[in-house]
Amino acid sequence: MHISPQNVKSFIAKFRRQKILVVGDLMLDRYIYGHVNRLSPEAPVPIVRVRDEKNMPGGAANVARNVKALGSGASIFGLIGSDQAGRDLLNVLRADGLSSTYVTTVNKTKTTVKMRVIGDRQQVVRVDWDNKPAINDGLLKKMCLKAVKATAQCTGVILADYAKGLICPEIVSSILKAARRNKVPVAVDPKVNWNLPMDGIAIATPNRKEAFSLAGIPETEPARNPLNDRALLRASDILMEKWNPSLLIITLGAQGMLVARHARPPFHVTTFAREVFDVSGAGDTVIGTMLLALSAGANDIEAAELANCAAGVVVGKIGTATCSGKELLEFTRDLRR
């Protein structure tokens, strides 16, 4: 690792000065935990005897939860339905100390829910209730005005798109204009169908599959060394020219991440994960940690290493997990032993 232990501690301390606004699709992550000891006589599937249930913030709300866990202030901008799942989501947001001032409840709309059944520390099945909120012209105008106000009151913005309808040209343009006016850095986690404004963004964090799709070229088998992966480097070059971000981070799962920047060669950060139980939300951890680290004064390499370490903590847990500042500090210390 290039980052020194002293700098890790200093950056984490500076996280507390930040106030991050997370804009995106909100959903409820519901976990059913149990024990498996036999197969069903009805079908070749395991029977899970339920021991516990837990609701967690999902989607963009999990990004905010990650930011909060690292010590920063966090506000959420998004929509929920006027249903029990929406109320459950508000309850877990409050329990986690996340500001829901900019969360709007839409009547006659259902909240997206993703339920995961975990049997003996292994995910057995995931069940999704996907819903897109109905955003009429009146609501859209109010949301744009609210987005401008929220952006002016934060130190950084994360646009977390989960393809559920909130991230649209009008809201994104309003946020980017307000961010430029207030000199607020914006980080974007784009999905494969992203075709929205990207003017002036600081960070973009697609995964490998998304990067190839957004670059418009076919995905190839990964090379052993990402810096020798010609197709990946071509996708990176295309996206740097297309979006013009300060930093492009392509997350590569077990291979870590590739980081591209202007006028300098890209660099590769290997994964620091020691155990992998669940990759749910690892990308949320990366974008939140990157923005916080850069805002705290870390350079490109230091920020990428911190983000990879935080992701290493998260994938070693079951469920939509987070990494605290203390865990991040301990993880980086353990890597040096």
Q: Each predicted region: which residue ranges?
A:
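Conserved N-terminal subdomain of the carbohydrate kinase-like
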Residues: 2-5, 11, 17-20, 28-158, ...
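Structural motif
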Residues: 21-23, 126, 155-158, 187, ...
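Conserved structural-core and active-site-/substrate-pathway-adjacent residues in large, well-folded domains
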Residues: 25, 67, 115, 157-160, ...
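Extended, hydrophobic alpha-helical segments in both membrane/secreted and soluble proteins
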Residues: 158-159, 175, 186-188, 194-197, ...
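Conserved phosphate/ATP/ADP-binding segment of small-molecule kinases
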Residues: 165-266
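Conserved post-catalytic alpha-helical subdomain immediately downstream of the catalytic base
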Residues: 246-247, 272-335
